[in-house]
Curated annotation (Swiss-Prot):
Co-factor note (free text): Binds 1 zinc ion.
Keyword Disulfide bond in annotation: no
Name this polypeptide is given: Endoribonuclease YbeY
Function: Single strand-specific metallo-endoribonuclease involved in late-stage 70S ribosome quality control and in maturation of the 3' terminus of the 16S rRNA.
GO CC list: cytoplasm
One Pfam family here: YbeY
One annotated GO molecular function: RNA endonuclease activity
Length: 155
């Protein structure tokens, strides 16, 4: 596996947005190891406002509400088989929704953000949770990638 060459491009809608870049890279490395990806991974992450999240959720999913994370994958994995890198796509994370959910679920913001980041990565790789069977499989994969970081509710 190509270590520490994975690239995460992060854009934020304001300067004081909190994100956890070191841990995001650790999770991306765990993701590559789990799926046996032996090339550089490129990922775009946009941290957005509630307004932008709601607007994108309506435009792309016809759901008129703010959501915690949206994933827009580059699904042409056949193309990336021929490339020296894998461009996974873009995760759009709603900063305010993460903060609210952290309170609701009694998690730290760090844990909520990074768990949803991991969840989004797995979506980008083609997994979904439309059925109970899919949900169990996806939860298992997310936990396998996330849990080695040992991030607790209080971190």
């Amino acid at each position: 596996m190509v270590k520490n060459t994975n690239l995460i491009n992060i854009s934020t809608y304001k300067n004081d947005v909190i994100y956890f870049e070191k841990e995001m890279h650790e999770i991306l490395n765990n993701f590559a190891k789990y799926f046996k990806i032996n090339k550089q991974i490129i990922l775009d992450v946009s941290i957005v406002s509630s307004y932008t999240s709601r607007k994108l959720n309506f435009e792309y999913r016809q759901k008129d509400k703010t959501t915690d994370i949206l994933s827009f994958g580059y699904d042409d994995f056949d193309l990336y088989d021929k490339m020296p890198f894998l461009n996974l796509g873009e995760l759009v994370i709603c900063n305010n929704k993460i903060k609210k959910q952290a309170i609701i679920f009694n998690h730290s913001i760090k844990r909520e953000f990074l768990y949803l980041f991991t969840h989004g990565l797995v979506h980008l790789y083609g997994y979904d949770h439309q059925s109970e069977k899919e949900k169990k499989e996806m939860d298992f994969i997310v936990d396998s990638i996330f849990n080695p970081l040992k991030i607790t509710r209080n971190d």
